[in-house]
């Protein structure tokens, strides 16, 4: 009888180095169903699943929703005195990407890496080349922590204003009746700085969202602006079976209710044939008017919502959690108290790196799942344009061949100009496959600021949280090894460093002359024998202690086992 590999793998002693002579290849789900891992997370440890609404549960259609926000913001600017010609602009989704930085001093849109090094610089619709960029940024570098000058446009809601800022700068720079200045533009005796223009745009965007007709127009045509996924009720019902589910949104109750009612508007329940359920029944806790990121700090007063009128009831809510009740305000501490959970019990799912992911992780220790809708297109380019990536690898090989037989004694200088030009051309072509600003995550070989934030703050990320449907709730999301250049470019072959390496490379922590070491330890022990300290030398651990990849906490597991045994007794 042949034992299946799934049975054999249950026993660690039977783990093979290869499978019947064939190298083991890790099974991976289809790319569009995948959840990607930055830090290992054991799903069976998660007791509560938290959701944001906008751009998470409710995904707004692109470019329709961005176009609506763009048009309404332009109309607002015109109503406060900006030129009527701006109404001719039409939102172009090919130009903006998230994670850009607006320089309020020079009016430039910047794409930067994690350290503030410039990757792309655009003034209006004009992309600046190296010499032009260095005129304003001599070191091609910005101080990212100068938040008074540099504003990061990180959210999906920022996309319309990102494009609008480019439109305004381009319009005022190239319109004959305005005179361009280094930090703004003039119209006769009137001067408008890029900083004040930026503030006008920010104020207009806020007005459109909070006082204008954006929400009203969205609700008038939900089918046009909001994605509806029939798998949503199924996933939430399965989450209900293994833990608690809660909703935390900055939106008010009336808007939330209409959006969520639409998302769950199916003739059946979680499965075809099952009875329809109201959206509130899928959540153990519902919080509106959350005011994130303040919600993850001191928060606001917790109040109860009258779901008939949408108004708030008088007084602070101090009672226990009641199923079906909708709350307003509160804080992340409130969530933990009402659900009886602690930080690492909670997996919070959202789209906003700062408002959802960074604050929930840094202040509460919640596990985090970042929704990145652009990932679908990024993966499409990564797979569909593989020939460009392969050509870059080939060019790198050609470059290495030119230097293959040269060392510090060589006077020969290989002509690498043609290879460099080709690398630049292929890299540019690759960037343009993503859009005018290139990939959300990289520019050539350099990762963007946005990519670094994803890796730093999101434990898991995917194009949609619906991808969790394709994993069991016992799944261990295990992070891959993040290789440094000396690991990713050096093959696993034995090299005797004593023969090959320079004598200057003397830091060896393993090849020790143990006889000499033991003698020195013996001498040291004799000289301080009267002191008798408990440990003279460290001992290598004999049990597994250096393990940080499995989302394990052995002490907690032992405590849980002890508690279960006590309950049985």
From Swiss-Prot:
Disordered, as annotated region: 527-569
Assigned GO CC terms: cytosol
Binding site for Mg(2+): 52, 54, 351
Molecular functions (GO terms): 5'-nucleotidase activity; ATP binding; GMP 5'-nucleotidase activity; identical protein binding; IMP 5'-nucleotidase activity; metal ion binding; nucleoside phosphotransferase activity; XMP 5'-nucleosidase activity
Stated regulation of activity: Allosterically activated by various compounds including ATP, 2,3-BPG/2,3-Bisphosphoglyceric acid and Ap4A/P1,P4-bis(5'-adenosyl) tetraphosphate. Binding of an allosteric activator is a prerequisiste to magnesium and substrate binding. Inhibited by inorganic phosphate. Inhibited by inosine, guanosine, p-chloromercuribenzoate and NaF.
Subunit structure: Homotetramer.
Official protein name in the record: Cytosolic purine 5'-nucleotidase
Species assigned in the record: Gallus gallus
């Amino acid at each position: 009888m042949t034992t299946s590999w799934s049975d054999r793998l249950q026993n660690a002693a039977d783990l093979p180095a290869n499978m019947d002579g064939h190298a083991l290849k890790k099974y991976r789900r289809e790319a569009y169903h995948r959840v990607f891992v930055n830090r290992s997370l054991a799903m069976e440890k998660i007791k509560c699943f938290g959701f944001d609404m906008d751009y998470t549960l409710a995904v707004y259609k692109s470019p329709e929703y961005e176009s609506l926000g763009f048009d309404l913001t332009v109309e607002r600017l015109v109503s406060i005195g900006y030129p009527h010609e701006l109404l001719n602009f039409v939102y172009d989704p090919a130009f903006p990407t998230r994670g850009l930085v607006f320089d309020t001093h020079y009016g430039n849109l910047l794409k930067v890496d994690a350290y503030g090094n410039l990757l792309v610089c655009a003034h209006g619709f004009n992309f600046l080349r190296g010499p032009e960029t260095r005129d304003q940024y001599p070191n091609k570098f910005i101080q990212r922590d100068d938040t008074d000058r540099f504003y990061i446009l990180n959210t999906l809601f920022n996309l319309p204003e990102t494009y609008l800022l480019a439109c305004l700068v381009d319009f005022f720079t190239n319109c004959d009746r305005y005179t361009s200045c280094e930090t703004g533009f003039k119209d006769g005796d009137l001067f408008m700085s890029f900083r004040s223009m930026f503030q006008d745009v920010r104020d207009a965007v806020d007005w459109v969202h909070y006082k204008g007709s954006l929400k009203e127009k969205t609700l008038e045509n939900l089918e046009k602006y909001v994605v509806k996924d029939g798998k949503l009720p199924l996933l939430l019902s399965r989450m209900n079976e293994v833990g608690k589910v809660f909703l935390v949104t900055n939106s008010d109750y009336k808007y939330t209710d209409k959006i969520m009612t639409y998302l769950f508007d199916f003739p059946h329940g979680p499965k075809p044939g099952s009875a329809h359920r109201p959206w509130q029944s899928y959540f153990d806790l519902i919080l509106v008017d959350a005011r994130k990121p303040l919600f993850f700090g001191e928060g606001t007063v917790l109040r109860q919502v009258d779901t008939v009128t949408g108004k708030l009831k008088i007084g602070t809510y101090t009672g226990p959690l009641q199923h079906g009740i909708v709350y307003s305000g509160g804080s992340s501490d409130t969530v933990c108290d009402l659900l009886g959970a602690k930080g690492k019990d909670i997996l919070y799912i959202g789209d906003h790196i700062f408002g959802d992911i960074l604050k929930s992780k840094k202040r509460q220790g919640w596990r985090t799942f970042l929704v990145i809708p652009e990932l679908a297109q990024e993966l499409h380019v990564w797979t569909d344009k593989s020939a460009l990536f392969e050509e870059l690898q080939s060019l790198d090989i050609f470059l290495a061949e030119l230097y293959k037989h040269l060392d510090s004694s060589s006077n020969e200088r290989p002509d690498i100009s043609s290879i460099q030009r080709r690398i630049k051309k292929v890299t540019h072509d690759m960037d343009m496959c993503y859009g005018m600003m290139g990939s959300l995550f990289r520019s050539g070989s350099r990762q963007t600021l946005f990519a670094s934030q994803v890796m730093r703050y999101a434990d898991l990320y995917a194009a949609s949280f619906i991808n969790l449907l394709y994993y069991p709730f016992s799944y261990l999301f295990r992070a891959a090894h993040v290789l440094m250049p000396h690991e990713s470019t050096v093959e696993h072959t034995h090299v005797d460093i004593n023969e090959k390496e320079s004598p200057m490379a003397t830091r060896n922590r393993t090849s020790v002359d143990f006889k000499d070491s033991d003698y020195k330890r013996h001498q040291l022990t004799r000289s301080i024998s009267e002191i008798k300290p408990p440990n003279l030398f460290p001992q290598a651990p004999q049990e597994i202690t250096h393990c940080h990849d499995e989302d394990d906490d052995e002490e907690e597991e032992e405590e849980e086992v002890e508690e279960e045994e006590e309950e049985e007794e």
